[in-house]
Structure formats: structure tokens, C-alpha cells
Amino acid sequence: MIPAEAKPAMQGALAGMLATCSADGTPNMIHVSQVFYVDPTHVALSFQFFNKTARNVAENPFVEIRCFDPKTGDRWILEARFVRRETEGPTFEQMDMQLEAVASVTGMTGVFKLRGADIYEVRSILRVPLASPAELRPATS
């Protein structure tokens, strides 16, 4: 179940990351423009992937997704399983509008084309809080 405090990391403000693995165990990691909250047990990723990522997901549907809370800096690590691709409907339409909004703000209108909303079932989720500056400061003698 996705906790409420994780939702800000799934609103498309910051790019996420997707780690996949081929059938032979070769890993691959890419940035994804959107990690989108669908419901308490599902997220959607924008399908704009390179062929290697799409092939990996077809061979092995288990992935790791990382997304980031833009206010707190917390990282959320999701273990998930690919369920389906949607090319129409409410989730696809909302993601397409978000992608266009980001493109217009960055001066890249018309550059990005959402090909699909890939729906993933979230199997586990872990919050990794951002370390405070005091925790990052080297120890002095």
C-alpha cells in the first residue's frame, strides 16, 4: 500500500528512475519523466522508453522505481510489477496533460509524446529520508 506521505513524490514534479533487468540478469537504469500515483496499490510510468527497457520489462516484469519528494527531498523506493499499458483513459489523459505542462514550462512543447501509461502494481515501498546537513558534515577532531 502506498502511504499518503509518498504521494507528493508521485505528482510529476521531479523525474524518477526505473531499474529493470533482462532475462539473463543484465541490469538497466533510466530516468522516467513521470511517476504517477494511480491508486493505493498502483503507479503509472510514462512510456517513452528505449527498446532495451521495453524488452527488459517484457522479459522480466519486476522493476525498481525511485521517486523523489520535491519538498522534503525524501526518496521513495518501490518494488513493483508491470501489469499493463494504457493508451487512453483517465490515467493516460492526466499524464499526457502533465507532460505537456512540463514541456511548455521548459520551452519544449511538442517534443515529448506520451506513447502509453505503463501501470505497475506496487509490491513494497521504502522511504529514505534526506540526511540533514549536520549528518552530512564530516566529523572534526
Can you say where each PLM-predicted feature lies in the sequence?
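Short acidic, glycine-rich loop/turn motifs
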Residues: 20-24, 67-72, 124
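Short, structured protein-protein interaction patches enriched in aromatics and acidic/basic residues
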Residues: 67-83
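Buried hydrophobic positions in well-ordered alpha/beta secondary-structure cores of metabolic enzymes
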Residues: 25, 56-57, 120
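Short beta-strand segments
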Residues: 11-48, 76
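C-terminal edge-of-domain segments
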Residues: 79-141
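A short, structural micro-pattern
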Residues: 12, 59, 74-76, 111-114
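Short, basic/aromatic recognition patches
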Residues: 1-15
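A short mixed-secondary-structure module that forms the rim of ligand-binding clefts
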Residues: 33-72
